């Protein structure tokens, strides 16, 4: 048999000697060509030099391997593993039967050989594991407590990691803040260093200047001392020369003068030049300072002037503001006045428009009345023709009426029938002319005088005890008054009038014709517009008809009544003195009792035209609707 060398694994490491991987192989000497298959394992020391009781306890529980390599005929070395441990007879299988092939197989050669495939290598490794650990330890089951413990440990580690991360973030922030502060401090340090260098330079320059000044002062003092000494020596020499001349007055040689000692100092010259420059700069600076002082004085003067001007301007602004306030108030007043004037202007414009419309209407009416005027003149001339009848018939009619007159206070009814064939036509122009003549006739001033006389007469009669019939005070009828034409039909009224005419006889007809002619000659009074309107309105209301329904028979009857009253007044004027008032006459006006008055003397047709021309169209416009009421 070949001798073998066993290499025992040392347990000197601090990790313990029980681990199979801790075995250290030892090289076999060259004399051993192959390992011995039936080699028995020898016990190896379980303790290492450096391990204590802990490593010794591990050697009791675990085993150790001893590996010996034997160099044989093959290129790769052979390795033999010897298991040493507490397994006892269970480890005897490593050296018998199944393990002999493993020990003899060159493992390194199998790993290096290129022909060996992956499955072969895996099978070899599996067999090796089975040979090394034929009876593995049973696996320990993991319980829920172990899982909870592990989870708790993991949570603690996560908490530690989170806290470490937070601490790291805070440290990073602090580090960034400190870095910024450090940068600021570095910049401040750099600026401070620059200032220090600048100050050092200035200090060095000042030291140099002070040293130069001190050196120059020392040199000047030395020069002054030397000059004083030289002056004293010269005085002494001069005295000696004088003494020698006294001793040797003639031909005495004069001693040569001593050369003056010259002190050449380049720093002194540089300092002098610098001093000159500094003096020049100082003078220049003084001039500039004086100039600046002058400028400051001028600036102060200008500032004072500006302040004065500003105060004046502020005063002017205050005055202007007051003026502006006053003007604004005036402007507001003017605006109010303007608004008022505009309102008045609008009102006046509206009035002007209304007046313009009225003037247009009046112009139209005037044009229409101008067209009607010649027809009315023709009708008036035709009626004047009736006045050319003899006065005798009129006087006869008057006498006949006096004989057949009624007693005082009675009402006389006259029924006249004028032949309508005597008139050429009965247009509306004739009705208008009759209305105007009626207005003028009724609104005579003598009518109002007669009314006053009647009142006085009534008062006298009351004193005497006689009660006269009540006169009519107003021309307007009462509200509940009804015209006779409305109460009695026209046919019956005509029949009554015809009866009256039949009783009077033909004499009354002749008297009526004469009275009509006389009335048309004498009816032209000048009356007031308002009085005329009232009378016409009362006449039309008494008739109960409008201007368009004016009855010619009724109008002619009124004219005849007025003519009769006029003739009676004329007769009374002949009998009664001029100072006495005219008697009162009452006639029937179609059912209404109207007081009559003396008539103004007649005028020609030209006066009638002038009177019509003087009347404004507005009065005529007012007369039209008043007559319609």
UniProtKB/Swiss-Prot annotation:
Residues 1-71, 213-261, 363-412, 458-531, 563-629 are annotated as: Disordered. The gene is Hap1. Residues 20-31 have a biased composition (Low complexity). InterPro entries: HAP1_N, Intracell_Traff-Reg. Residues 237-249, 388-399, 606-623 have a biased composition (Basic and acidic residues). One of its GO terms (molecular function) is signaling receptor binding. PANTHER family: HUNTINGTIN-ASSOCIATED PROTEIN 1 (PTHR15751:SF14), TRAFFICKING KINESIN-BINDING PROTEIN (PTHR15751). Keywords: Autophagy, Cell projection, Cilium biogenesis/degradation, Coiled coil, Cytoplasm, Cytoplasmic vesicle, Cytoskeleton, Endoplasmic reticulum, Endosome, Exocytosis, Lysosome, Mitochondrion, Nucleus, Phosphoprotein, Protein transport, Synapse, Transport. Residues 1-12, 52-62 have a biased composition (Polar residues). In the brain, especially in the olfactory bulb and in the brain stem. No detectable expression in peripheral tissues such as lung, testis, spleen, and small intestine. Residues 32-44 have a biased composition (Pro residues). Residues 158-262, 474-583 are annotated as: Interaction with TBP. Residues 80-404 form the HAP1 N-terminal domain. Residues 277-445 are annotated as: Sufficient for self-association and interaction with HD. This is Huntingtin-associated protein 1. It holds the Pfam family HAP1_N. Residues 215-236, 480-495, 505-528 have a biased composition (Acidic residues). It is found in: Cytoplasm; Presynapse; Cytoplasm, Cytoskeleton; Cell projection, Dendritic spine. It comes from Rattus norvegicus. Residues 169-300, 328-369 form a coiled coil. GO terms for cellular component: autophagosome; axon cytoplasm; axon terminus; centriole; centrosome; cytoplasm; cytoplasmic vesicle; dendrite. Residues 153-320 are annotated as: Sufficient for interaction with KIF5B.
